[in-house]
UniProtKB/Swiss-Prot annotation:
Subunit structure: Interacts, and probably forms a ternary complex, with MukF and MukB. The complex formation is stimulated by calcium or magnesium.
Recorded family membership: Belongs to the MukE family.
Ranges of biased composition (kind: Basic and acidic residues): 217-227
UniProt keyword terms in alphabetical order: Cell cycle, Cell division, Chromosome partition, Cytoplasm, DNA condensation
Region annotation (Disordered) ranges: 213-247
Protein name: Chromosome partition protein MukE
HAMAP family to which the protein is assigned, alphabetical: MukE
Function statement: Involved in chromosome condensation, segregation and cell cycle progression. May participate in facilitating chromosome segregation by condensation DNA from both sides of a centrally located replisome during cell division. Probably acts via its interaction with MukB and MukF.
One of the record's GO cellular component terms: nucleoid
Organism expressing this protein natively: Histophilus somni (strain 129Pt)
Acidic residues compositional bias, start-end: 236-247
Subcellular locations according to the entry: Cytoplasm, Nucleoid
InterPro entries: MukE_C, MukE_N, Scp_MukE
Length: 247
């Protein structure tokens, strides 16, 4: 029996699983969380055992990915044995806006701190508000109630992205203030090209990939067909989590 276990587990993998940090890190990864260098202990643990843990997770048909920016996350395959879900189109668009803000001069000017309201305003500024409202409700006519629902959806999207490790709350949990993690580059694979990153991200947002019901479905179908080619749009599955507001 012992020999069989040793055949399945390398000594280093056994050490990784026996490490006190493993249960916490494993739970976070399975929930869809991205682990960057700001999580010092957990990040160091993953860096030390990256190869062994990747082999471990491949048994569940998922991969342990270390992005070019350095953060870790699990990328499910179509046959994954770990539960997954898809980010909504608005959540993905909010993620793109966060990536844009991360690259913007305002990030340095504001010491890296943004608010939920700023994200909402930037989203309206960069995208067509009418199309955004239609994306949430095809019958939306631009009423105050429609705009209120959009604001609530934006807050929910930010809250979910926070739970995925893409932003970090600052101060009181109800302050609505946060910093943006490098893991938002899951939404900006295209900006790794030779083009100016800020202009590339701005172009992506203005193209309105999540603008209308038809384009939303076309984008979703395209993402599924090219699952292995994009850092986010082709790897958009995350663990289901309950909605909760950050503001």
């Amino acid at each position: 029996m012992t020999d069989n276990i040793q055949d399945l587990l390398s000594i280093k993998l056994a050490r990784a699983i026996a490490n006190p940090l493993f249960p916490e890190v494993d739970s976070q990864l399975r929930s869809g969380k991205h682990i960057g260098q700001e999580y010092l202990d957990n990040y160091s643990f993953l860096a030390d055992f990256q190869h062994e843990l990747d082999s471990f997770y491949r048994r569940y048909n998922v991969e342990l990915i270390r992005a070019p920016e350095g953060f870790f996350y699990l990328r499910p395959k179509a046959t994954t044995l770990i539960a997954r879900s898809v980010l909504s189109e608005l959540e993905m668009l909010v993620g793109k806006v966060l990536c844009y803000l991360y690259l913007s001069p305002e990030r340095l000017a504001q010491q890296g701190i943004f608010t939920v309201q700023e994200v909402h305003d930037e989203l309206i500024n960069l995208a067509d508000e009418t199309k955004l409202l239609k994306a949430i409700n095809l019958r939306a006519g631009g009423s105050d109630l429609d705009k209120q629902k959009l604001a609530e959806k934006v807050r929910s999207a930010i809250s979910r992205l926070r739970r995925l490790g893409m932003i970090h709350a600052v101060g009181d949990q109800h302050s609505g203030k946060f910093t943006i993690s490098e893991s938002v580059f899951r939404f900006g694979a295209e900006v790794r090209s030779g083009d100016d990153p800020l202009e590339a991200q701005l172009r992506l947002i203005r193209e309105g990939e999540a603008a209308t019901a038809q384009s939303l479905q076309e984008e979703k179908n395209g993402l599924k067909d090219n699952m292995d080619q994009s850092a986010v749009e082709n790897e958009q599955y995350f663990e289901n989590e309950e909605n909760e507001g950050i503001a």
